[in-house]
Amino acid sequence: MAAIKYRLIKKDSRTNARLGILETPHGVIETPVFMPVGTQATVKAMTPEELKEIGATIILSNTYHLYLRPGHKIIEKAGGLHRFMNWDRAILTDSGGFQIFSLSSLRKIKEEGVEFRSHIDGSKHFFTPEKVIEIQNALGSDIIMSFDECAPYPADYEYVKNSMELTIKWAERGKKAHKNTEKQALFGIVQGGIYEDLRKECAQRLVEMDFPGYSIGGLSVGEPKNVMYDIVDLTTEYLPENKPRYLMGVGSPDDLIEGVIRGVDMFDCVLPTRIARNGTVFTSKGKLIVRDAPYAEDFSPLDEECDCYTCKNYSRAYIRHLFKANEILAARLATIHNLYFLIKLMERIREAIRQDRLLEFKKQFFKKYGYKEEY
């Protein structure tokens, strides 16, 4: 039996948006869905119970970081990642490809795999597609990723073509190495930079390999938004309708809406948790930097329209005070709010698809939030 099962429930009549159900070994997920990021087996500042309270059904964790610390063998001894971190809902792990790409000066790419130095202590390591599968098998996540090379932006055509070829070869090797297919679904990752022919070729060749789902990687790495949207549009066209599609590392409110319109089902991003720790929050009227002086005597909630724990109980003035005093609670309250905001946004998007009014929803949301409708 397959580890996951995707059911397409409804398609939007005027866009490529889809409403779906993704069944995993650790629960059923309504899509489109946003996945909070728990890089080191924790969503920063949140307990698993709090994540459940805000409606998170799946989180993301990171193969590269967990391999280096505490080590996948230790997590395996603990009974797997779910038990280790006390999270009984679904987990997706990424392959570490993006993290190694970020270490440009500390890595060497070969056909066999990638040699890199740990960002923690400088020790040498070697990742192959097989090794990455072995690590993720030990972690026991529900959805795992093929090892890929995330080409930088900008990069010339030849470099990206070679990088794409490598990603396809690695996907094949990873698929052969993956034995735990009944409990873990392996996704192929579509690369190809901003080159349409490469994206098309990569998608088609991965689809021939018949993965249970497909990721769109190598975007949101510095390219203009309209270019990213065009590539997503083009890529989803070549992906099967009966499999989930995951846009990696994308999670601002406008990107979530635009991604859904282009047929994406799953998203993840560190943005909501990272900006929360720096005192920036999402509101229905746009971003707000709560640590700024104007909020010193503002006793209204972060967002009048939000019913998260933070907004029901605390004022902007209080949260600003916590940030100014470097109190840990500041990051916790802002993180709870930001993740709740995005999870609620996805709920509203799903409802808009259900009612066939996603474009109207986008128009209203963008106008209120302060986005220009230029895409």
Curated annotation (Swiss-Prot):
Entry superkingdom: Bacteria
Binding-site list for substrate: 94-98, 148, 191, 218
Entry keywords, A to Z: Glycosyltransferase, Metal-binding, Queuosine biosynthesis, Transferase, tRNA processing, Zinc
Single GO MF descriptor: tRNA-guanosine(34) queuine transglycosylase activity
Top EC class, one word: transferase
Gene3D superfamilies linked to this entry: Queuine tRNA-ribosyltransferase-like
Pathway membership, UniProt: tRNA modification; tRNA-queuosine biosynthesis
UniProt cofactor note: Binds 1 zinc ion per subunit.
Residues annotated as catalytic: 94, 268
One Gene Ontology biological process: tRNA-guanine transglycosylation
Similarity field: Belongs to the queuine tRNA-ribosyltransferase family.
Quaternary structure (record): Homodimer. Within each dimer, one monomer is responsible for RNA recognition and catalysis, while the other monomer binds to the replacement base PreQ1.
Name listed for the protein in its UniProt record: Queuine tRNA-ribosyltransferase
